[in-house]
Amino acid sequence: MVDNTADIKPDRRPAIVICAYEPDDTSWDPVEDLSGLLWNPVGARTVAVTAQEPEQLAAILNRHLRERECRAVLLVGRNRRSEAFRLQMRAENRALTGGARLTRNGPAVARATAPIADMVRALHDAGLVADASSDGEEDAGDYLLYSLLANLRDDADAPAIGLLRTPYDSTAAAVRKGVKAAAGAIARHLSPLPHARHI
């Protein structure tokens, strides 16, 4: 009998976690078609995380970021301030409610590590109106973005973390196009995972 297991190559594509964090927003479906398979950007593989309570979601996403395979997180929410697809460039140290600081020792502001300019360009190339802004919104997206960024190790090779806000009245087709464009732009900056060391 021929052993084919030696011919199976490990998947060295880095993982990009995509999370639409608003429970009532069903416009982003990571399943590509009737095959039931997840959509993957070129050069990366998608890990879909479903919406939950913000504190639980922050814990889940931070666990993913501690895994060697996870090289990016794309949060997906709604833009209630304009009709554009918007990349949020930073998040403030602010609790979900009450206006207090989320963490006493964290920086006042944390900047997104995702390639914002390339993501905006990719959205434009997809035929979508898009921009980038330092202004956040008082929602779970701002909280999650800061929570993830504040917990990153001080490392030059930090994972790419970004927040895409889609227009509030976008169609599901437009949202899918926007998420795919933004995730694809992130994936182009990711390197294949290193080969596993055999001891």
PLM segments and residue spans:
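Active-site-adjacent mobile loop/cap segments within catalytic or ligand-binding domains
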Residues: 145-192
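N-terminal catalytic or cofactor-binding beta/alpha core of small enzyme domains
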Residues: 1-138, 149-154, 158, 176, ...
